Amino acid sequence: MKSIKRIGLCISLLILSIFVTSCDGDNKITGDSKETQIKKSFSKTLDMYPIKNLEDLYDKEGYRDGEFKKGDKGMWTIYTDFAKGNKSDELDDEGMVLNLDRNTRTAKGYYFVKKFYEKDKLPDRKNYKVEMKNNKIILLDKVEDPNLKKRIENFKFFGQYANFKDLENYNNGDVSINWNVPSYDVEYKMSNKDENVKQLRSRYNIPTEKAPMLKMHIDGDLKGSSVGYKRLEIDFSKEGRDISVIDYLSYKPAKK
């Protein structure tokens, strides 16, 4: 049930969690070829991490295809959320999405707070508008809760402190492909000694010592596409309790 709720959030942000199956069931493959291709596809954005100053994205161009209109410099969208289930089978989820328009060199988005319930109760959701100037998040809406206000104004995206320079050293991952979409997934067991894991533990309340899984998902052409997307998840979930961080960086047309 909680997985369905988690998918619901991703759908609202066009980040669709796809259960990777083929017509006959799971289509698992082995071998390094596809695994290497998936990592190389991810490295096009992960090699940019850490992006300490998000305004650097104004001067970076991503993959362009026929979806871009002439003269459109494109828009980067960066997203991070942290979701944690509790003993009441509820799921609390907080995060931020920011759109950086390279044409206008402006960045606008929102911070969201969501709670999903196990029973037939609609989720609670609140969005708080933000913008970014001089690499600083500026809260545009009034927030009464001082702790929430502080979390919003001090928010850092995973891509601002993550480092995947050693991505090529991740090997023997569990690879899955759905040729019908197409979509590609690979999972790796991480170590608690990993600097990215240490960073997340220092920033979020993660009530488990369980080493997480690194899950990389690509929807669309491995070579690149402004229609598809890539999603990275670090999953600390344990004994049916959802605990995970989702990261997303995409480059798409800014002009419709």
Curated annotation (Swiss-Prot):
Q: How does it sit in the membrane?
A: Lipid-anchor
Where is lipid attached as S-diacylglycerol cysteine?
Answer: 23
Name the lipidated positions (N-palmitoyl cysteine).
Answer: 23
Top-rank taxon of the source lineage equals Bacteria
Which cysteines share a disulfide bond?
none
Q: What is its main location?
A: membrane
Name the UniProt key words of this record, in alphabetical order. Answer: Cell membrane, Lipoprotein, Membrane, Palmitate, Signal
Residues spanning the signal sequence: 1-22
Keyword Iron-sulfur on entry: no
Give the GO cellular component terms, alphabetically: plasma membrane
Entry's localization field: Cell membrane
Q: Fetch the InterPro entries from UniProt.
A: Csa, Csa_sf
Concerning its family, UniProt says:
Belongs to the staphylococcal tandem lipoprotein family.
What this protein is called in its record is: Uncharacterized lipoprotein SAUSA300_0414
> What species is this protein from?
Staphylococcus aureus (strain USA300)
